[in-house]
Structure formats: C-alpha cells, structure tokens
C-alpha cells in the first residue's frame, strides 16, 4: 500500500505543470505546491517516529514554494520513508511509540502515514480533475509490447 501511495503522489508531481503549482480551488485550501510540501513534511514526521522514535521536522511546507524546490525535497522525504519501511520487521512493528500524544505501535504509525498520504492524494486528484488532468491512478498503463512470432 505504501508503494501505491508514494507512486501516486510522485506521479502527480510529474503530471502537474509548473504554472499550476500555485493553483488552489478556493482561498481556504492548500495549493498544489503546499500539498506536495505538506506530504513531504509528513513523511519525515511519521517515518521519523517509526524509525527513530521521534518526529523529524524539515519545515518544507513553510520554507519551500516552487516546484524546483519542492520536488527534490519530496523525493528525499520519500527516500527517507522507503528506508523506514524497509527496516520494519515483525518484532519492531509491535514496539510502542508516541504519536500526537498517543501510544501506538510503529506499524500503526506507518499505516497512518499511508492513510494520510492517500488523503492528500485525494485532494490532488480533485485539483487535477478541475484542471483537466487525468490523475496517475486513472491513467491507463502503456500498451504491452507485442510479441512477434
């Protein structure tokens, strides 16, 4: 599930052109740029708690504004989480950590990361549809190479 969530987010990055990164459907909601930056920050928060027992703060949403700045930060955040997921074992998944003043398992934190990422993927899908862009999860796969006999 994590691979699907991260691939959907990274797929959006590729599909949303630079000129739309400041787009927000209403003034009360985040722009494309703010959503991508928020997801990057959240990767550090959740995977930091699961991997290091503490939230890691990068301040991406507050400090980075452009696609050129946010994309590398998002990719680094995803790589950080890739490492955290790779280190998850049956034994350490059940270890308890603190998240939002609650005691939860490390696996619970990682599951919450997936849910949070997909929540914001849903926001991105709506924004993309409003701009006539087909989101990654609705894009048909490329045709398979035909086999010659």
Annotated model-derived regions:
Residues 7-10, 20-59, 98-149:
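Short, contiguous alpha-helical
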Residues 65-98, 105-121:
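Acidic/histidine-rich alpha-helical segments that form the ligand environment
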Residues 1, 5-12, 42, 70-84, ...:
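Alpha-helical packing segments of well-folded alpha/beta enzyme cores
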Residues 28, 39-40, 63, 67, ...:
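Generic structural signal for well-ordered secondary structure
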């Amino acid at each position: 599930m994590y691979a699907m969530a991260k691939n959907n987010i990274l797929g959006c990055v590729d599909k949303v052109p630079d000129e739309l990164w400041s787009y927000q459907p209403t003034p009360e909601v985040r722009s494309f740029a703010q959503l991508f930056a928020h997801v990057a920050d959240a990767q550090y928060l959740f995977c930091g708690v699961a991997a290091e027992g503490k939230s890691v703060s990068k301040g991406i949403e507050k400090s980075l504004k452009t696609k050129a700045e946010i994309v590398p930060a998002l990719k680094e955040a995803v790589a950080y989480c890739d490492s955290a997921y790779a280190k998850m074992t049956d034994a350490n998944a059940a270890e308890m950590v603190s998240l939002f003043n609650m005691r939860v398992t490390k696996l619970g934190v990682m599951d919450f990361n997936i849910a949070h990422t997909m929540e914001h993927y849903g926001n991105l899908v709506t924004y993309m549809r409003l701009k006539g862009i087909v989101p990654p999860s609705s894009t048909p796969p490329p045709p398979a190479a035909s086999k010659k006999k």
